[in-house]
Amino acid sequence: MPNYRKLGKLPPKRHIKLDRPQGESHLGEGIYYEHILTTVGFDRAYSIMYHLRPPTRVRAVERAGEVKLEPAEEMPLRHVHLRTADLQRQGDAITGRIPLMFNDDLVAYRCRPAAPQETLYRNGAADEVIFIQSRGGTAETTFGRLRYRRGDYLVMPRTTVYRLIPDDLGQEDYLFLEARGVIRTPARYSNPDGQFLLGTPYSERDFHSPTELNPVDDARDTVLLVKVGTRLTRMTLAQHPLDVVGWDGFVYPYTFNAWDFEPLTGTVHLPPPFQQTFECDGFVICTFAPRYLDHHPEAIKVPYAHSNVQADEVLFYVEGDFASRRGVGECSLT
């Protein structure tokens, strides 16, 4: 995320006490409990949170299964069109994910849940991009409550505890991307001061972080489902983990809406990098938003044939018509 945010109660400096009335505090210690979330070791962005209770207390740990990534049978090299609009609803926003494609850099899932997400979830080893295909809802997270709507990219940094609460369960529809690296905006979009350049396809105003903290003061055991790689672990914590009273930093969940993307056009066809939205280790995410087609008087208003031999290209169709494809529909993947 491009800039610093803060929410809730904070002490004036890092690593000093944030006092609270001793009668209200855990074991009468009179403090809130500092918790630092770092990325890339200690070398990149981080955030500092303050909990009602120590976030380290775990009552029990048990295996909870595995997400199996089984490659399809060996087949001839060919184009693929997956129609996913009518996938049968199953599970919840976590257990209902169906893996469709994967490599060493990411896993792509479709998810049309049949049940509400009851158990809190944390991906311990991957950033997640959750594209909201239908309706909206609220994400309850370590960093507070965050509204999402149709067309949002909901970016969830690794280790964030969250639960998705849709406005209409019957319309809940997601595309999940699970990333080995850190999801970020393209470096070329920012000036040396960290601000988006004029002329980039979005600005800081288009990114939305949690605006409301609702710390849960609950000392009862709470179940948390944790995913690391393909392995699932069920942890029983000694308190509710969404008990943060304040945080600040550069790591937090946020939304960016595809309809806020400001597409670039040219006299002739521009290649996909001009529509780039995010980057990560080994892949990029582009948004092909509605835009004027090429306006050179002799322009051929369809993309030229090209061989992108060092990358796989996957398109997810949200709505509308796409100039270079026929026969696709909403929620098609090619």
Locations of the language-model features?
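Jelly-roll (double-stranded beta-helix
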Residues: 1-334
